[in-house]
Amino acid sequence: GILRTLFIMTKDDEWKDEMEAFYRTDVAVPADLIVDGKLYKDIGLKYRGNSSYFSVSPDLKRSINVYLDHKDQKQKLLGYKTLNLLNGNSDPTFMREVIYSHVARNYIPAFKGNFVKVVINGESWGIYSHIQQYNKDFLEDNFKTRGGVRWKIGAGGGGSGTLRYPGEKKEDFGGFQQRTENAEEAWEELHQFTKMLDEAPIAELDKKLHGRLDVDGALWSLALECIFQDEGYFTRGSDYNLYLDPDGRFHLLQHDGNEVMSIPGGPGMPSGLQGPKLEPFYNADNEDRPLMYKMFQVPHLKARYRHHLKTITEEWISWDKIGPIVNQYAALIRDEVKKDVRKHSSYEAFEKGLVESSSDGRRTKLGLKPFTIDRREFLLNHPEVNLPSPKIASLTEIDQGKSAESYRVVAKTTGNTKAETVILWHADGFNEPYTPVAMHDDGKHSDGKAGDGEFGADIPSQLAGKKVRYYVEARSGGKEMTSDFYPARAEAGPLTFRVKAAKATDSVLRINEIVAENKSVAKDQQGDFDDYIEIVNTSGAKIDLSGKFLTDDDKNPRKWKFPKGTHIGAGERLIIWADENGNAEGGLHANFKLDKAGETIQLIDSDSDGNLILDEIKFAKLETDQAFRRIPDSKGNPSKGNPSPGKKN
């Protein structure tokens, strides 16, 4: 890894006093920043945090927000406009939150984390852990959008932040701190969601949550909080983030993890907790934690949570897995920690905290190594976790996933615990909710013989170019349902395929001619010499091109759509200008240009007609003003030659 140094130069020597005075205000202290030799002018500094502020004297390191966009809204550091510099309060290793983020990002949208050295006005302030800010940059990284609405439910969110329905008024949601500007209408969405969660009968909860909550993501998030003994929704019903995406679905996200892998002393943790022994279903009977209280009463959701808990523990909670990461981090920051005179604990506490637990007589501080080893032992041998379940041994895909075709999947189940129900889950789009399809062991779905433990089902036909995500769930019967998933990470790591466009066998439309570098052949309606594609209708009837597509990318066959009302007459030719100027008035202008070095151009049928490939041309390098055209016209194999736009070749 890389340990970067942030050189901060404040405008005033009294910067600490100013930052104290402006704590929890909108005022930032101005400064300049140098990183990797590059100067970032007019940044802003603010103290952040709660206990990491009040329990620390100003002469020791406090947590700091660095705002790159304090004056210049476009200024960013390596793509990010806000830096969260955390002081390692209550963590002499500085590593807990970075490790937590590293693991969590395998299962949920979670913050990136690393370490930096900070120098202020020429004086070293030592090592800080650096955790990504919960802002629009985070949304873009994880949800591929900058839209939606963000809430933070702080440590003091308590009763009004637990997602229990608090009442009709916005003021009743006092624990929710909205982080998105100009989003008043989102309060009604939150109001309706908490009311639904409060009122929905258990028998209808699954249906009510579909499309309103990322259920699988919420269960992964709860499992992570339990495993790492995090002070979040799982324990205290606060100290978490909530995100409402542009499609109206809520996501339960992590807020911080500075006290994970320990025994936090705040509210919410069970009294008398000794060591890494937080129960896997702690708070499951607590009506003031409605997300768990309700979901854990739905047998298959409780089984899904149990599976996720076990999966994370088996994949990550092992010193063979965590140990090398700890050693790598320690090697990166050890020398600076040793020299750091602003840290809150000793260098000896840093080294000891990696591999040993310690006690001051009042409170035990768990070392990273003993926590990892003992937590794994506790959870994997816990009677609520170590339950027999069906096993999905393998998945077979029968079809290749072309447009206008379904995609058959066969799952083979094994083990002593019979799979009573097997479900194929699928979704298209990056953030779409999954749709369940019942799988059958009846010998009629490519599944061998009836009753042999093989189950088959089809993903319905999808639009060409769509990336389809899917996985399979096998559920047991019995009083305490258990589940298995293939792949094990379910929605956090599904199988995928991209739908390919199938070829039509009777198309009367032809790509007749292309020019990939037009310098003098023909001008478009705007007077520009642009690349062009010529299509010809070889039939004796007028054809409506509305909703059909042109593309130069077989992974995106629906790239440019013919506008509504576009027709081509019998025997006629039509020119489409490939100039990336789709909004130009007059003529047809595609949203891509041609590559004179060579590529493939496809004419794709409409969504309603299955996105079949009506015609395609693959061309090699073309010279300026050279055409690639069919000879004889509209019928022959294409070859290089002289252009004749709008006329017979």
Regions inferred by a protein language model and the residue ranges of each:
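Middle-to-C-terminal accessory/interaction subdomains
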Residues: 3, 14, 23, 38, ...
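Internal "kinase-insert"/substrate-recognition segments embedded within catalytic cores
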Residues: 63-73, 80, 87-88, 106-111, ...
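Conserved NTP-binding catalytic cores of kinases and kinase-like/nucleotidyltransferase enzymes
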Residues: 1-94, 99, 411, 415
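Extracellular acidic, Ser/Thr/Pro-rich low-complexity tracts
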Residues: 409-418, 428-430, 476, 537
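Structural beta-strand segments of beta-rich domains
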Residues: 405-409, 529-531
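Intrinsically disordered, low-complexity linkers and terminal tails enriched in Ser/Thr/Pro/Gly
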Residues: 362, 366-391, 395, 464-649
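Aromatic sugar-binding surface patches on proteins
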Residues: 445-458, 572-575, 582-584
